[in-house]
């Protein structure tokens, strides 16, 4: 687990990164807790096909190749909740007062809920997005978890993910 990313990492990823998060330069910690999981593994092939055919285009091309390499062994199911006892904030998991939603699940859902999904029919005027601009450090969330959520809901994928590097100001 990386506390900077607020994300679980697989044993393979931890080994490949020599136990250090490449984005935060801090060691991963071993963590065990009860969570709900989103079965994104079931969508690996459909996501791969959407990216390979540019139905969900990833630009620049080297970021597309980077994510397709990440997809080679399929996606791992992802924890979608955290124990409430460990957090002083969070959206409660419906029907389970002991759990709150993992921040990336509710953050990604904002793309469609802010335009009225599922209650206001006008949301369909704005979705699918023509372009989503994201940072390089959140590509796996936007090209893996987010498409799996959309496919699970039977919704179309964004048309393009434009992945930029980090923008700094004054050396920061």
Question: What do these predicted regions represent?
Answer:
Residues 1-15:
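Cys/His-rich Zn2+-binding cysteine-cluster or related metal-binding knuckle/ribbon modules and their
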Residues 18:
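Residues immediately within or flanking Cys/His clusters that coordinate Zn2+
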């Amino acid at each position: 687990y990386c506390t900077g990313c607020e994300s679980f990492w697989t044993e393979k990823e931890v080994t490949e990164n020599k136990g250090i998060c490449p984005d935060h330069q801090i060691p991963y910690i071993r963590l065990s807790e009860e969570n709900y999981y989103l079965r994104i593994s079931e969508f690996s092939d459909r996501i791969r096909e959407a990216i390979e055919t540019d139905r969900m285009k990833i630009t620049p091309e080297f970021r597309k190749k980077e994510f397709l390499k990440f997809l080679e062994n399929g996606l791992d199911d992802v924890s979608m909740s955290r124990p409430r006892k460990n957090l002083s904030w969070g959206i409660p998991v419906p029907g389970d007062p002991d759990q709150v939603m993992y921040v990336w699940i509710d953050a990604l859902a904002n793309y469609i809920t802010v335009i009225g999904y599922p209650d206001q029919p006008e949301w369909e005027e704005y979705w699918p997005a023509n372009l989503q601009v994201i940072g390089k450090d959140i590509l796996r969330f936007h090209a893996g978890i987010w498409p799996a959520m959309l496919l699970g809901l039977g919704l179309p994928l964004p048309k393009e993910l434009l992945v930029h590097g980090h923008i700094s100001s004054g050396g920061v």
